[in-house]
Amino acid sequence: MGWLTKILKGSSHKFSDGQCNGRYREDRNLEGPRYSAEGSDFDKEEIECAIALSLSEQEHVIPQDDKGKKIIEYKSETEEDDDDDEDEDEEYMRAQLEAAEEEERRVAQAQIEEEEKRRAEAQLEETEKLLAKARLEEEEMRRSKAQLEEDELLAKALQESMNVGSPPRYDPGNILQPYPFLIPSSHRICVGCQAEIGHGRFLSCMGGVWHPECFCCNACDKPIIDYEFSMSGNRPYHKLCYKEQHHPKCDVCHNFIPTNPAGLIEYRAHPFWMQKYCPSHERDGTPRCCSCERMEPKDTKYLILDDGRKLCLECLDSAIMDTHECQPLYLEIREFYEGLHMKVEQQIPMLLVERSALNEAMEGEKHGHHHLPETRGLCLSEEQTVTTVLRRPRIGAGYKLIDMITEPCRLIRRCEVTAILILYGLPRLLTGSILAHEMMHAWLRLNGYPNLRPEVEEGICQVLAHMWLESETYAGSTLVDIASSSSSAVVSASSKKGERSDFEKKLGEFFKHQIESDSSSAYGDGFRQGNQAVLKHGLRRTLDHIRLTGTFP
């Protein structure tokens, strides 16, 4: 009893005062409600201790004088009633405790539901923003294509520029000459200012007559005094002004694109970037970026890699240059496969190598399908020694990479797959898609798939590369998994990297476009067949069908 008294001295004092002259029952009933009202300030343990203390004091009060005897006698006479009251008090206190607990649970549940509702609304709002942005980008691409078509039409129209002359003249060098006879002024209203044209010089063209100062170029707003002028949408232009506004310019040399021997304006345009350039740049050695394929403009310098490739500065911004730097991305690709329930159990070495080392390794490989203009990744099955890029090079004079450290690496075969080799110096998204492609080769070999035709093996590998790019494009938003029946929605761990630049997002769309528009039989046709199969049947059923038949379903 000592430790209870120490904790609840106030409560002990109040209950002991209520035990004299037979008024214990009445005082306890008065004290009970007040105590329950204050009980919200105590936790359950304090209330239970108070009840135990009260009961203990009632049972152990044994006075020694005559008055004490009276009290004891009174208690024994009313002992049964007191027990009932005590039971009622305990029941009341327990009811209060249960009510308080229920209220706490209800409030907590309401708070949880409110928080979940708020998060769901925030997620929905974010998804709507991303979808709106995607629609905006699609609209911009559509407008770019429309603008390109309009440029082509304008280029043709330029060849048929309108030659407008005045009525028969005495001086052929003067476009502004009077009529050989007088016309009443009421019959001559200037199309430009709607005022009458009096006696004097005037210009007759475009189905009307003009004051010389009213017939102006729509671009520079200066009078057109030349014998010839150009038209666009019923608006007149100086020939030079029209050319400046509507004649296509080369995005590489920044000059007007010249006409061909037939007198027509002919130029090339990249199907994705819409970069316009003179046909001559395809023959004069103008370099292209090895990643995005854009030509190098004359006022911009591309970075020169050790193996001769050139890299634009935008692609350089996210380029992966050595094996160590690529390891986090390699782990992300493995996590991507785990999310598809296609975990690669074997720890396969992954190395970044130069182009020469990749070509040598490809020659030593006994089997494989490599029909691309340039091999950028390889899944090895044979023991070889390859040279890997050990340390990231730095940029030296003339935008050349220098001080790159390499070392030979002996690859020992411990399973069906020896290593995965990736070409160094490519942007993160391109490196990741190549890794996802080669990882699928490894998965097929480690899981006992038979020797497949190139269209089937390369096609399904391209499907996985495309799926990874899709997950990167929509990272952080709601994904509709294209392999819906085979796995849950896959969100790449790269979504933790934060917001990517607009160019990197555009670059991801370009790499998807490359896969989708590939014209080769193994990679292009194979991807389109495999992608249709996955969309229709799901990834898991497609893989099961390939295992059984060696073909797409």
UniProtKB/Swiss-Prot annotation:
One of its GO terms (biological process) is regulation of DNA endoreduplication. Residues 42-61, 87-106, 122-141, 149-168 form the UIM domain. It holds the Pfam family DA1-like. It comes from the Eukaryota. GO terms for molecular function: metal ion binding; peptidase activity; ubiquitin binding. The keyword Membrane does not apply. Coiled coil: none annotated. The modification Phosphoserine is found at residue 166. Residues 78-91 have a biased composition (Acidic residues). Residues 188-248 form the LIM zinc-binding domain. Polyubiquitinated by DA2. Disruption phenotype: No visible phenotype. Residues 10-41, 62-91 are annotated as: Disordered. Residues 62-77 have a biased composition (Basic and acidic residues). Keywords: LIM domain, Metal-binding, Phosphoprotein, Repeat, Ubl conjugation, Zinc. The keyword Repeat applies. SMART domains: LIM (SM00132), UIM (SM00726). Interacts with ubiquitin, TCP14 and TCP15. PANTHER family: PROTEIN DA1-RELATED 1, PROTEIN DA1-RELATED 2. Acts redundantly with DA1 and DAR2 to regulate endoreduplication during leaf development. Together with DA1 and DAR2, modulates the protein stability of the transcription factors TCP14 and TCP15, which repress endoreduplication by directly regulating the expression of cell-cycle genes. The UIM domains bind molecules modified by monoubiquitin or ubiquitin chains and promote coupled monoubiquitination. This is Protein DA1-related 1.
